[in-house]
UniProtKB/Swiss-Prot annotation:
It comes from the Bacteria. Residues 691-745 are annotated as: Disordered. Its cofactor is Mg(2+). InterPro entries: ExoRNase_PH_dom1 (IPR001247), ExoRNase_PH_dom2 (IPR015847), ExoRNase_PH_dom2_sf (IPR036345), KH_dom (IPR004087), KH_dom_type_1 (IPR004088), KH_dom_type_1_sf (IPR036612), NA-bd_OB-fold (IPR012340), PNPase (IPR012162). One of its GO terms (cellular component) is cytosol. It comes from Rickettsia massiliae (strain Mtu5). Its main location: cytoplasm. This is Polyribonucleotide nucleotidyltransferase. Residues 554-613 form the KH domain. Gene3D superfamilies: GHMP Kinase, N-terminal domain, K Homology domain, type 1, Nucleic acid-binding proteins. Belongs to the polyribonucleotide nucleotidyltransferase family.
């Protein structure tokens, strides 16, 4: 019944298996990818005919993670997979980028590639399998897919490169890099790095490139046995058509490209296609040429003009040399109500960035095949239509916006402080207000400025730069800080972000074959010099984080309590913690280890919540001094309430150094007095003294001492030995330790 064909290879100690002919047999191409316990189904469907009047290649890639692959039922009301998650969007783009340039340039038939994770093994990088499976399925389909692509993931642990590291290993890795390419050249790189040098990054790319060559071999073997006849393709346009357009319109195109302003240049260039189509209207009606052929020939002429100026004259359309960076302007603190803000402008590209602090309750919850986890740092990239003067409605975040945001996130994440150093969740929003190339790198620069102004103690400022490439034969030019047109007509988009010490993120997309490691080395070094120049300009405005947070930022403090006290703070059904939040206006988050984080809009609210938590969870120690309230006066003494919910007794002899006739002559109900805990009676009730309590210089009112000496009698040391044991088990962090962050002093 099935004519199944299978090819396999042992790759990094595990068997990688590609098979076809059993599942999804009606699709134009279908490959099942297996490695470990991971199983993916990758399918391709190609439309029989191209749509009339289409002027681009309509390739759609959809990567899906089925919940059942990890033995889970989807969350939510409908209990089924729905809108693509950010992770699925990012992997879809990861598949698309190395594959899209490898189709015949004249191919415009609608093509759909679907990669579904059917079984999930956390030891196997399924995004890598998806790229491999998509490439294999395309090689079997009728689509004119010209090269086979494979991919690998590279980590760096203890100075050694690791192929396809597990999720657990990636937690300790200095590098998370994905590289994809053909048997001859690298096509795509995506990475996050912890301040690695250009040499280390290049070696990592080489390592990954060499590692996936055996995979390309089995894709080719599978295609040789199972591929379908490829669609026959003609040239994108007749050579005679291009020559005729050049003869008639080349001077007008050159004049338009000589305009340095993007807005004016685009306006003039946009007038030319209509003139060209009008000239060839009879040929279009007679079906000698199609609109797409004419527009493609015109684009080729525009490309030739731009590329020749660069290669022959070392001159770009805005007048810069290949290494020049556009003029930079930086401004900080322009949004008074935001916790941090910055405006970064580079030429005609501009990003307005804001930083907002939240609590641990504001962290992004992510539900993935690995399980649920939280992201403390969020970065949202927004690309509104007005940034390129387009009259379009604002829509939900596009795939491009998700991808650019993640790239900027990768660039910033390695230099952020950990949660102990900075207890807030952080959201950065970067809105591209103008765009003419490299808006994602403007986002990186603006984010670094906004974070420093907000007072986030980042390790070092970060800047990003986009590099381009123009290559004809052996002649090439690497371009620094590319424009939109240079990206469109060029051969490479190479984005590098990092500090003055090293790289934090790298993304490379190559549109042609034959880009070797020599060119990549030149591009990396040129990017380093450009990055240092940009950092120098940024540092003139702000070079290190502000010492204080914005007055609009929430206040926070933490207190460590005994884990047994957690239930007391929460209360039945959360009653107690809800009441504390309502009374104080603060937000409270309790970790399983007994760390209580309190967040409030001001310090007064913070103190109210802190005092109430301490009253419940903190056990007083002998020798500590508190503010107390006289609750009841007796002939023999008085009952005092302290720490909110604790009561003790002051004997008449402990009220004053001098002899007093009656307690009521000194104390009245409602009086506020300072009291010192001097011990406990045989029933465990607190014994207090007022004598000299207000003169004790060690008094800190409500802040308990963690190292107070225990001078009480044995029967008075109520559970003190138990407390000491608990403290030792918790690295001497006692239940009474309060940490108030320096950012609020």
């Amino acid at each position: 019944m099935f004519n199944e064909i299978t090819k396999s290879v042992t790759w990094n100690g595990k068997v990688l298996e590609l098979s076809t002919g059993k599942i999804a047999r009606q699709a134009d191409g279908a490959v099942t990818v297996k490695m470990g316990n991971s199983v993916l189904l990758c399918t391709v469907v190609v439309a029989n005919k191209a749509k009339e009047g289409i002027g681009f290649f309509p390739l759609t890639i959809n990567y899906r993670e089925m919940a059942y692959a990890a033995g889970k039922i989807p969350g939510g009301f409908f209990k089924r997979e729905g809108k693509a998650s950010d992770r699925e969007v990012l992997v879809s783009r990861l598949i698309d980028r190395p594959i899209r340039p490898l189709f015949h340039p004249a191919f415009v038939n609608e093509t759909h590639v679907t990669c579904s994770v059917l079984s999930y093994d956390p030891e196997i990088p399924v995004d890598i399998l998806a790229i491999i499976g998509a490439s294999a399925a395309l090689s079997l389909s009728p689509a004119p897919y010209l090269e086979m692509v494979a991919a690998s993931k590279v980590g760096l642990i203890n100075g050694e490169f690791v192929l396809n590291p597990t999720l657990e290993l990636l937690k300790t890795s200095q590098l998370d890099l994905v590289v994809a390419g053909t048997s001859d050249s690298v096509m795509m790189v995506e990475s996050e790095a912890h301040l690695l040098s250009e040499e280390q990054m290049l070696e990592a790319v080489k390592f990954g490139f060499e590692s996936f060559q055996p995979v390309i071999k089995i894709i080719k073997e599978l295609a040789e046995e199972a591929k379908k006849p490829k669609l026959e393709m003609q040239d994108l346009y007749p050579a005679s058509l291009k020559k005729e357009i050049e003869k008639l319109f080349v001077k007008e195109i050159e004049q338009a490209f000589a305009i340095k302003s993007k807005q004016e240049r685009s306006t003039n260039l946009d007038l030319i296609p209509e003139k060209v189509l009008t000239h060839f209207v009879s040929d279009i009606e007679n079906k000698k040429y199609s609109n797409y052929q004419i527009e493609s020939a015109l684009k080729a002429i525009e490309s030739d003009i731009l590329r020749n100026e660069i290669l022959e004259k070392n001159r770009r359309i805005d007048g810069r040399s290949t290494t020049d960076i556009r003029q930079i302007a930086c401004e900080i603190g322009l949004l008074p109500s935001a916790h941090g803000s910055a405006l970064f402008t580079r030429g005609e590209t501009q990003s307005l960035v804001s930083t907002t602090f939240g609590t641990s309750l504001d962290e992004q919850i992510v539900d993935s095949l690995e399980g649920e986890y939280k992201e403390r740092f969020m970065l949202n990239y927004i690309f509104p239509p007005y940034s390129v003067n387009e009259a379009m409605p604002m829509k939900v975040p596009s795939r491009r916006e998700v991808g650019h945001g993640k790239l900027a996130w990768r660039a910033i994440n390695p230099i952020l402080p950990n949660k102990v150093q900075f207890p807030y969740s952080i959201r950065v929003v970067a809105e591209t207000t103008e765009s003419n190339g490299s808006s994602s790198m403007a986002t990186v620069c603006g984010s670094s400025l906004a974070l420093m102004y907000a007072g986030v103690p980042i390790k070092a400022p970060v800047a990003g730069i986009a590099m381009g490439l123009v290559k004809e034969g052996k002649k090439f030019a690497v371009l620094s800080d590319i424009l939109g047109d240079e990206d469109y007509f060029g051969d490479m988009d190479f984005k590098v972000a990092g500090t003055s010490e090293g790289i934090t993120a790298l993304q490379m997309d190559i549109k042609i074959s034959g880009v070797d490691f020599k060119i990549m080395k030149v591009a990396l070094e040129q990017a380093r010099l450009g990055r240092l120049h940009i950092l120098e300009q940024m540092n003139k405005v702000i070079s290190k984080p502000n010492n204080e947070l914005s007055k609009n930022a929430p206040s926070t403090t933490t207190i460590k309590i005994d884990k047994d006290k957690i239930r007391d703070i929460i209360g039945p059904g959360g009653k107690v913690i809800k009441e504390i939040c309502e009374i104080s206006g603060a937000k409270i988050d309790i970790s399983d280890d007994g760390t209580v984080s309190i967040y409030a809009s001001d310090r007064d609210k913070l103190k109210v919540a802190l005092d109430k938590i301490k009253a419940i969870a903190v056990e007083p120690e002998i020798g500590e001094i508190f503010n107390g309230t006289v609750m009841k006066v007796l002939d023999s003494g008085a009952f005092i309430n302290y720490l909110g919910n604790k009561d003790g007794f002051v004997h008449i002899s402990e009220i004053s150094e001098e002899r007093i006739e009656t307690v009521s002559s000194v104390l009245k109900q409602g009086d506020i007095v300072k009291v010192k805990l001097i011990g406990f009676d045989n029933k465990g009730k607190a014994k207090l003294t007022i004598k000299n309590a207000d003169k004790d210089k060690s008094s800190n009112n409500t802040k308990p001492k963690t190292n107070a000496k225990d001078n009480s009698e044995p029967e008075q040391r109520r559970d003190s030995s138990k407390k000491r044991a608990w403290n030792e088990d918790n690295n001497a962090e006692t239940a009474e330790v309060i940490t108030e962050r320096k950012y609020f002093n």
